[in-house]
C-alpha cells in the first residue's frame, strides 16, 4: 500500500480561508495525478449536504470532494455540529443524527464518541481509497488554550496522522503578523515541527509590497512563507452564515432584484449559489427590521429552527410585509423551512424547532399547508420530473424533519408527491415552496423560473439550455487552483 504523507490546512482564526485553500489543494493534487481525500474531523455548520447513501455532512467537505474529483461521502466529515441556538447543537456522527449537545457539556459528554467517529471515518476513507492522500482541514484556531486538551480536529489529528501542516492567515482583516507569531508561540514543542509553511491569504495589491513582511516572518518564525494568495473572496460564497453579513450586493446594472430573508437560523444558504452566479439579477439580503421593499421576487431559504424564525418574522414585522407583498401580486419561492413558514399551521410535538411548546403554531398562511415536525429525518437524494414552471428533469436532496400536507387547491411542483407545491395568486403573483435543496442548481428550471419574473416586467427571456450549476462550480474550482498553483510553492509541504 502506497500511503502518502497526509497534509493539513490550519488557520490562525475562523474565516481565514481554510475551506477554500483545502479545496484548492485538493484540485491541484488531482491535476497532478494524485487522489486527494478531503477530511474534516469535526465541523460546525448549518450548511449541509446529503450524500448518495443518505448521510449528512458539511457542504464545504462536499465542495472539497468535487475539487478532488470524488463524490462526497459523509466519512469525509464524520462529526458535524449543527447549531440550534441557545448554546445547543444537533450532533451528527457518521452522517446520522445521534443527539443534542449543550456547549458547556459537549467535551465532557461527546469527546470520546467524537474521537471514535473520527477514527472510523478515517478508516473508511483509507479502505475505500488505499492509495489516496488525506488532505485535512482544521477548525477555527488550533491554539485555543482552553480547548486544546479536548481538541478533536486540529493538532490532535495532525499528530495522530503525522500530517504536514500549512498555516493560513487572513491579511484582509489586519493583524496578520500577530496572528501568525502568536499561533506559533502557543504551539507545544511537539507540535511546532508539524508546521511546514505559512500561507498569506486575501492579499490586495502587488505581491512585492509584502516582500518585507515575508522576510520578517521567515526570520522571526523560522517557517517559510509558501505563498501569498490574492483576494478571491467573490469566487465562492462564504461557508458560515455569519460571513453573510459581509456580503455586498451586486450593484451593477441588473434586470431583476430578488430579496432573500436572512433569518437567525438560516441554513443551507448554498441553495442560493446559482443565483449569485446569474449576471442579470441582484440578490438583496433582508434582515429583521429591514424594509422588504418591492423586489421582483422574495426567497425564503431553509431554517434550522423554523418556529424560532417564525417568531422573528412576527416580532420584526416582516410577516406583515410578506403578506402585503403577496397580496399585491408578489412572487415568493421558499425552500424547506422557508416553505414550512409559509403554511397555515405547524405542529411540533417533540419541540424540535425552537418553539415554546408543541403548538399548533399559526404560520404565515400564504400557502394552505400543514406541517408536523418529528419522526425520522428525511435524508435522501432525489431525481424527479418538474411540472412547474415547465416540464424538465431536476435533482436535489431532502434534508428535513417531519412532513407537510397540502390542500387540494395547490399544484405539485414535480411528479413526486410531498416535495413541493405552487399556486397563482389573484393579483397575478405566484407562491411556491419545496423540500428540494439544490433545486436552483438545475439550470433549465432556474431559468424558467427567472423567465416568469422577466415576463412580468416585459423583459426578453433568457436561454434555458444551461448545464447543472455543478459545471459552473467546476470552472470556479479550476480558477481557484490556477491561482493557487501560480502563487503557492507546495514543495516543502509535499516532503515525505
Swiss-Prot record:
Q: Which residues does UniProt mark as catalytic? A: 336, 437
Q: Domain (GATase cobBQ-type): give its ranges.
A: 255-445
Would the keyword Metal-binding be found if you checked this record's keyword annotation? Answer: no
Q: Which GO BP terms apply?
A: cobalamin biosynthetic process
Q: Enumerate the UniProt keywords alphabetically.
A: Cobalamin biosynthesis, Glutamine amidotransferase
- Please name the Pfam families in this protein's record: CbiA, GATase_3
Family, similarity comment: Belongs to the CobB/CobQ family. CobQ subfamily.
- The protein's name is Cobyric acid synthase
Q: Which organism is it from?
A: Parasynechococcus marenigrum (strain WH8102)
Amino acid at each position: 500500500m502506497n500511503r502518502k504523507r497526509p497534509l493539513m490546512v490550519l488557520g490562525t482564526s475562523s474565516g481565514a480561508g481554510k475551506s477554500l485553500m483545502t479545496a484548492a489543494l485538493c484540485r491541484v493534487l488531482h491535476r497532478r495525478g494524485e487522489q486527494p481525500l478531503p477530511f474534516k474531523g469535526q465541523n460546525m455548520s448549518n450548511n449541509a449536504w446529503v450524500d448518495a447513501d443518505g448521510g449528512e455532512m458539511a457542504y464545504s467537505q462536499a465542495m472539497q470532494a468535487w475539487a478532488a474529483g470524488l463524490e462526497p461521502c459523509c466519512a469525509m466529515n464524520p462529526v458535524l455540529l449543527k447549531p440550534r441556538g441557545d448554546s445547543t447543537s444537533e450532533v451528527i456522527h457518521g452522517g446520522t443524527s445521534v443527539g443534542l449537545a449543550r456547549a458547556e457539556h459537549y467535551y465532557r459528554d461527546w469527546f470520546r464518541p467524537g474521537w471514535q467517529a473520527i477514527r472510523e471515518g478515517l478508516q473508511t476513507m483509507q479502505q475505500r481509497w488505499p492509495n489516496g492522500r488525506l488532505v485535512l482541514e482544521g477548525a477555527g484556531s488550533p491554539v485555543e488554550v482552553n480547548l486544546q486538551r479536548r481538541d478533536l480536529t486540529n493538532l490532535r489529528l495532525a499528530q495522530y496522522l503525522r500530517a504536514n501542516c500549512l498555516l493560513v492567515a487572513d491579511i484582509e482583516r489586519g493583524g496578520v503578523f500577530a496572528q501568525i507569531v502568536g499561533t506559533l508561540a502557543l504551539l507545544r514543542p511537539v507540535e511546532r515541527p508539524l508546521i511546514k509553511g505559512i500561507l498569506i491569504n486575501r492579499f490586495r495589491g502587488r505581491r512585492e509590497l509584502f516582500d518585507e513582511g515575508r522576510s520578517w516572518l521567515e526570520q522571526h518564525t523560522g517557517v517559510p512563507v509558501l505563498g501569498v494568495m490574492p483576494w478571491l473572496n467573490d469566487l465562492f460564497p462564504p461557508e458560515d452564515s455569519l460571513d453573510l453579513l459581509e456580503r455586498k450586493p451586486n450593484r451593477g446594472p441588473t434586470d431583476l432584484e430578488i430579496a432573500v430573508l436572512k433569518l437567525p437560523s438560516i441554513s443551507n444558504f448554498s441553495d442560493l449559489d446559482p443565483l449569485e452566479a446569474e449576471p442579470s439579477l441582484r440578490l438583496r439580503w433582508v434582515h429583521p427590521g429591514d424594509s422588504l421593499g418591492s423586489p421582483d421576487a422574495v426567497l425564503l431559504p431553509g431554517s434550522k429552527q423554523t418556529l424560532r424564525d417564525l417568531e422573528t418574522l412576527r416580532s420584526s414585522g416582516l410577516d406583515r410585509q410578506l403578506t402585503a407583498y403577496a397580496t399585491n401580486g408578489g412572487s415568493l419561492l421558499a425552500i424547506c423551512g422557508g416553505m414550512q413558514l409559509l403554511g397555515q399551521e405547524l405542529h411540533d410535538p417533540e419541540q424540535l424547532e425552537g418553539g415554546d411548546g408543541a403548538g399548533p403554531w399559526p404560520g404565515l398562511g400564504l400557502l394552505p399547508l400543514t406541517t408536523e415536525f418529528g419522526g425520522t429525518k428525511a435524508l435522501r437524494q432525489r431525481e424527479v420530473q418538474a411540472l412547474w414552471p415547465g416540464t424538465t428533469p431536476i435533482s436535489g436532496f431532502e434534508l428535513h424533519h417531519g412532513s407537510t400536507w397540502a390542500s387540494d387547491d395547490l399544484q405539485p411542483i414535480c411528479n413526486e408527491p410531498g416535495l413541493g407545491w405552487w399556486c397563482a395568486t389573484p393579483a397575478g403573483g405566484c407562491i411556491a415552496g419545496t423540500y428540494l435543496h439544490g433545486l436552483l442548481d438545475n439550470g433549465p428550471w432556474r431559468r424558467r423560473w427567472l423567465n416568469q419574473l422577466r415576463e412580468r416586467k416585459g423583459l426578453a427571456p433568457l436561454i434555458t439550455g444551461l448545464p447543472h450549476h455543478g459545471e459552473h462550480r467546476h470552472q470556479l474550482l479550476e480558477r481557484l487552483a490556477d491561482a493557487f498553483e501560480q502563487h503557492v510553492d507546495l514543495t516543502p509541504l509535499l516532503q515525505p
